[in-house]
Amino acid sequence: MTIKIGINGFGRIGRVLFRLAQLRSNIEILAINDLINVQYIAYMLKYDSIHGNFNGKIVIKNETLFVNGKKIRITNEKDPKNLMWGDLNIDVVIESTGIFLTTEDSYKHIQAGAKKVIITSPPKDNTPMFVRGVNFNEYVGQKIVSNASCTTNCLAPLAKVINDEFEIVEGLMTTVHATTATQKTVDGVSYKDWRGGRSALQNIIPSTTGAARAVGKVLPELNGKLTGIAFRIPTANVSVVDLTVRNKKIATYEDICQIIKYASNHDMKEVIGYTEDHVVSSDFNGNTLTSIFDAKAGLSLNNNFIKLVSWYDNECGYSSKVLDLSEFISTFS
């Protein structure tokens, strides 16, 4: 079964996801909608400062984009209702504009003929969120879903492994997060977040994150037990979660590492990674796992109170799981 996908919004996630989709024979991207023209879409797809040049053939003929010989329909519609996804029999629309963040707004894609929609951000309403390795089993055919955030995709699988085995009593999370497109290169106006308006090139910027609270939505047993903050740092890609928890069951740090290592080779094999190497952030650039546990970076105060460190490529890891979710929901009518 070939899954036919349309992308609405060709930003960082849209482009990285497009690249990763080329490696999956069961996924075909048939259309891209963005406000930029086909020439600029081709340029941004071909060249990437973080992930390098596109490994494939890109051709424009008569204002039409062809990638590796396959035609990609390019449109420039502001209103998703006008996208005519039905003409291409689109199975899943990847809603990656960062604008249509509710079921009501994203339903316009359904009205345009798409069968299902994945929002690539935490929703601003009660649209259900699904995280691979955590709650895919709760999907029952909803037409519009969210893949949560990149940080939630790192934190939730790790928290699930720990909670299932040791029962988390409470915890705090910090994500040290690479720069994203919403930040300013030099100091600028940011009424909603004054610190967020400061130069991303020169500062470590304290910020908020809903990732820890979102874990309580995909793992209800942890609802109200986790919260956290973020620091935006001047690196281009790859982020890291620092999770400090108090567990009910006693275990040494070494015991906990072994449980995570086991999960990385079994139930969480394509989600969680495990390393004992002396790694740094750039070592994970391009990694499609969403939570790579760093055994040498964590520690414990005692047998109930531990600090866990897990890396994630906030672009590739997340985008790969959007594709996984696309494959999964397409098996439901």
From Swiss-Prot:
GO terms for biological process: glucose metabolic process; glycolytic process. NAD(+) binds at residues 12-13, 34, 78, 120, 314. Its main location: cytoplasm. Catalyzes the oxidative phosphorylation of glyceraldehyde 3-phosphate (G3P) to 1,3-bisphosphoglycerate (BPG) using the cofactor NAD. The first reaction step involves the formation of a hemiacetal intermediate between G3P and a cysteine residue, and this hemiacetal intermediate is then oxidized to a thioester, with concomitant reduction of NAD to NADH. The reduced NADH is then exchanged with the second NAD, and the thioester is attacked by a nucleophilic inorganic phosphate to produce BPG. The keyword NAD applies. Its EC number is 1.2.1.12. D-glyceraldehyde 3-phosphate binds at residues 149-151, 180, 209-210, 232. The record marks 177 as: Activates thiol group during catalysis. This is Glyceraldehyde-3-phosphate dehydrogenase. Coiled coil: none annotated. InterPro entries: GlycerAld/Erythrose_P_DH, GlycerAld_3-P_DH_AS, GlycerAld_3-P_DH_cat, GlycerAld_3-P_DH_NAD(P)-bd, Glyceraldehyde-3-P_DH_1, NAD(P)-bd_dom_sf. CDD domains: GAPDH_I_C, GAPDH_I_N. The gene is gapA. Belongs to the glyceraldehyde-3-phosphate dehydrogenase family. Keywords: Cytoplasm, Glycolysis, NAD, Nucleotide-binding, Oxidoreductase. The active site is at 150 (nucleophile). It catalyses: D-glyceraldehyde 3-phosphate + phosphate + NAD(+) = (2R)-3-phospho-glyceroyl phosphate + NADH + H(+). Pathway: Carbohydrate degradation; glycolysis; pyruvate from D-glyceraldehyde 3-phosphate: step 1/5. PANTHER family: GLYCERALDEHYDE 3-PHOSPHATE DEHYDROGENASE, GLYCERALDEHYDE-3-PHOSPHATE DEHYDROGENASE-RELATED. The keyword Oxidoreductase applies. GO terms for cellular component: cytoplasm. It comes from the Bacteria. GO terms for molecular function: glyceraldehyde-3-phosphate dehydrogenase (NAD+) (phosphorylating) activity; NAD binding; NADP binding. Homotetramer. It is found in: Cytoplasm.
